Amino acid sequence: MSYVCLICGAEVDIDTEKSLVQCTNCGGRILIKPRPLAKKKRVKAI
């Protein structure tokens, strides 16, 4: 799974076998799942 570090913003791949939840770039342990971009709904003009 790919996560995003909250401190430095780097993408981090996490090993589920070792269960190391830590950023490889800055060493931060606060990681969030990247959200998919919201789809904009088109509204027809009246």
Curated annotation (Swiss-Prot):
GO molecular function annotations of the record: DNA binding; DNA-directed RNA polymerase activity; zinc ion binding
Lipoprotein in keyword set: no
Swiss-Prot/TrEMBL catalytic activity: RNA(n) + a ribonucleoside 5'-triphosphate = RNA(n+1) + diphosphate
Cofactor binding summary note: Binds 1 zinc ion.
Annotated Zn(2+) binding sites: C8, C23, C26
One BP annotation, GO: DNA-templated transcription
Enzymatic class: transferase
UniProt KW Disulfide bond keyword: no
A Pfam family it matches: Zn_ribbon_RPAB4
GO cellular component, one term: cytoplasm
Major location category of this protein: cytoplasm
Subcellular location field: Cytoplasm
HAMAP family: RNApol_arch_Rpo12
Function, in words: DNA-dependent RNA polymerase (RNAP) catalyzes the transcription of DNA into RNA using the four ribonucleoside triphosphates as substrates.
Name of the protein: DNA-directed RNA polymerase subunit Rpo12
Organism: Archaeoglobus fulgidus (strain ATCC 49558 / DSM 4304 / JCM 9628 / NBRC 100126 / VC-16)
Lineage: Archaea, Methanobacteriati, Methanobacteriota, Archaeoglobi, Archaeoglobales
Gene: rpo12
